[in-house]
């Protein structure tokens, strides 16, 4: 169940608080009955899966055809995704730390906004208003992406959705003003691929898994960093995601002292179009066939377990490899080091006075989306309100 957040007002708290901390992620169905709606929203999102003019026709068709298969996958991992549980836990624990280290912006209120599953962005925004933010009362909210590496198809899509619902529930469509007085002031933590705390949390999980191999074999274990793939049409447009994922991998290997051979591979390709490779499943099969059977898979772009780790990596890739030497590093989940990293990132952002990173204001070279342009203008422009 979602954590109940009591209503708060500016007058009852510190001079700059309360602060809403909104964790953004793709989400996942909590039960098998929710799979159909989850897939319908996912395949309707042209930012994530671009199908062009046929999006409205092909999206529903693909989602209906895939629903029975995906329901079986969620049934195999316990009946639903744990991503909501972990997101609510991580955000709640982070806010407890922030209340201690940043009393001037306290209390910090945790919220979760998923792109394709409950709680959806619309639900989150409605709760913000019900809890005393905006609607003439002002207040600050931080959209904290839980994709460490930025992509227009993930963080960008979530921000497009947030911007849409902000306009519908607080903006011009509601009261006729683009920037109504007393609306929520937003800022964005839009990427954090090489934050030292993130790198340390990943590195310690890798070290823990390496320790399960005999000492004489340990240095020869191949580390396979696996991230969600992207369509090449998105990559060729100039999306920064591949470079930022590679930066995370390099930072983790640097922290490990480049102790092992390693490669970066990509998972979760959907459909016949070209996607970023090499694929994780093909990579594991290739090395096992060559006799390299000691492999550690590291989910490097995910902040918690979900279907891509618990089913795709654990039950498909590792199980089909058929060798006990093929293992997976634990996901970040409830790692205290990771949660402290989240708090450190948020603390630095709250003190920094900027509404987003310098990178976020720069569009991809091949971007032609007017929605993306207007969304970026909005969030970049919020810096003017933060300095008031």
Where do the PLM segments sit?
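Active-site-proximal alpha-helix that buttresses catalytic centers in soluble enzyme cores
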Residues: 2-388
């Amino acid at each position: 169940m979602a954590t109940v957040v009591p209503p708060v007002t500016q007058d009852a708290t510190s001079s700059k608080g309360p602060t809403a901390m909104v964790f953004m992620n793709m989400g996942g169905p909590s039960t098998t009955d929710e799979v159909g709606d989850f897939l319908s929203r996912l395949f309707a999102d042209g930012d994530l899966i671009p199908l062009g003019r046929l999006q409205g026709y092909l999206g529903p068709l693909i989602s209906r055809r895939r629903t029975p298969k995906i329901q079986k996958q969620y049934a195999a991992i316990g009946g639903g995704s744990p991503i909501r549980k972990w997101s609510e836990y991580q955000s709640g624990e982070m806010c407890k730390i922030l209340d201690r280290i940043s009393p001037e912006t306290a209390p910090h209120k945790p919220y979760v906004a998923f792109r394709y599953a409950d709680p959806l962005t619309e639900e989150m925004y409605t709760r913000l208003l019900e809890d005393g933010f905006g609607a003439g009362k002002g207040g600050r909210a931080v959209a904290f992406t839980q994709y460490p590496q930025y992509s227009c198809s993930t963080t960008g899509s979530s921000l497009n959705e947030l911007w849409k619902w902000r306009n519908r529930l607080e903006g011009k469509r509601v009261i006729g003003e683009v920037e109504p007085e007393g609306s929520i002031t937003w800022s964005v933590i839009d990427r954090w691929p090489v934050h030292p705390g993130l790198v340390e949390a990943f590195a310690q999980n890798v070290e823990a898994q390496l320790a399960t191999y005999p000492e004489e074999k340990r240095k020869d274990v191949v580390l396979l960093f696996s991230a969600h793939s992207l369509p090449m049409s998105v990559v060729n447009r100039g999306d920064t995601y591949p470079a930022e994922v590679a930066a995370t991998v390099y930072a983790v290997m640097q922290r490990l002292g480049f102790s092992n051979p390693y490669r970066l591979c990509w998972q979760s390709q959907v459909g016949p179009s070209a996607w970023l490779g090499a694929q994780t499943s093909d990579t594991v099969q290739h090395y096992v066939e060559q006799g390299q059977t000691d492999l550690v898979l590291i989910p490097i772009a995910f902040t918690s377990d979900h279907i891509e780790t618990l089913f795709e990596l654990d039950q498909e890739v590792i199980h089909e490899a058929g060798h006990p030497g093929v293992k997976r590093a634990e996901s970040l989940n409830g790692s205290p080091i990771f949660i402290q990293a989240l708090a450190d990132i948020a603390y630095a952002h709250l003190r920094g006075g900027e509404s987003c990173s310098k990178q976020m204001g720069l569009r991809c070279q091949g971007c032609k989306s007017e929605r993306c342009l207007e969304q970026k203008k909005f969030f970049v422009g919020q810096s003017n309100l933060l300095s008031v």
